[in-house]
Amino acid sequence: SDDKCQGRPMYGCREDDDSVFGWTYDSNHGQCWKGSYCKHRRQPSNYFASQQECRNTCGA
């Protein structure tokens, strides 16, 4: 499986105006979840623009 899928899942940014939404893979559950990260931080490796991209990459 892809290294992107093994990264720590992104859980969300608490500051709403700073949030970038996307999808993340949770290897514990084997599923793609909707999540977000804070714009002022680096984009997490476990970030996908769409649910389809997440599923295709991680086989969820």
UniProtKB/Swiss-Prot annotation:
Keywords recorded for this protein, A-Z: Cell adhesion impairing toxin, Hemostasis impairing toxin, Platelet aggregation inhibiting toxin, Secreted, Toxin
Expression tissues: Expressed in salivary glands.
Gene Ontology cellular component annotations, sorted alphabetically: extracellular region
Domain of life: Eukaryota
Compartments where located: Secreted
InterPro entries hit by this protein: Kunitz_BPTI_sf (IPR036880)
A GO MF term: toxin activity
UniProt motif (Cell attachment site) ranges: 14-16
Role according to the record: Tick salivary platelet aggregation inhibitor that plays an important part in the anti-hemostatic strategy of ticks. Inhibits fibrinogen interaction with platelets. Acts by binding (in a divalent metal ion dependent manner) to the glycoprotein IIb-IIIa receptor (ITGA2B/ITGB3) on the platelet surface and inhibits aggregation induced by ADP (IC(50)=99-104 nM), thrombin, collagen (IC(50)=64 nM) platelet-activating factor and collagen. Interacts to unstimulated platelets (Kd=42.5 nM) and to ADP-stimulated platelets (Kd=39.4 nM).
Name of the featured protein: Disagregin
Source organism: Ornithodoros moubata
